[in-house]
A protein has these predicted regions:
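Class I SAM-dependent transferase core
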Residues: 1-78, 121-131
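Conserved SAM/SAH cofactor-binding pocket of Class I
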Residues: 59-143
Length: 143
């Protein structure tokens, strides 16, 4: 699935993305392809499925909120919410969700430094000011 198919499917369910969201989602593919050529972030056999298997899958959380917990979704849209993505790996589901919900503060945490390096680099390249990446084990996080 390429970006255009992703966007069409997204808009069927949600409505239009902003131009900034489109720019960011479109950039995801190239950013992860670049990182994946250096370290194995996503299965190399699955890179062509990044939108279907990683981005849309990540946004399934938002779809669940839309269908089952609309009151929570409204809080996410309004902002002031903090979300912890524990075991984020290279940034899924946190980065796609951060693109979709720019008013939500996302903390992406993983114990593997190279994966957090990828997530941090991708978030920075996308200009996601609502993302913080932390290299730590869950039990070491302050409560």
């Amino acid at each position: 699935m390429d970006y255009d198919v992703f966007e069409a499917l997204f808009e069927q369910e949600w409505g239009s993305l902003t131009e900034e969201q489109k720019r960011r989602f479109r950039a995801v593919d190239a950013l992860y392809r670049d990182w994946n050529s250096k370290i194995n972030v996503i299965s190399r056999k699955d890179m062509d499925g990044i939108y279907a298997h990683h981005v849309l899958h990540s946004l399934g959380i938002a779809l669940y909120l839309l269908n089952r917990r609309p009151e929570v979704l409204e809080k996410w849209k309004a902002g002031g919410v903090k979300v912890l993505d524990l075991g984020t790996g290279g940034g899924f589901p946190g980065i796609p969700l951060a693109i979709l919900f720019p008013k939500v503060k996302f903390t992406l945490c993983d114990s593997i430094a190279k994966k957090i390096t990828v997530a941090s680099s991708v978030a920075s390249a996308l200009g996601l000011e609502n993302v913080e990446c932390v290299n730590a084990r869950a039990e070491s996080l302050p409560v």
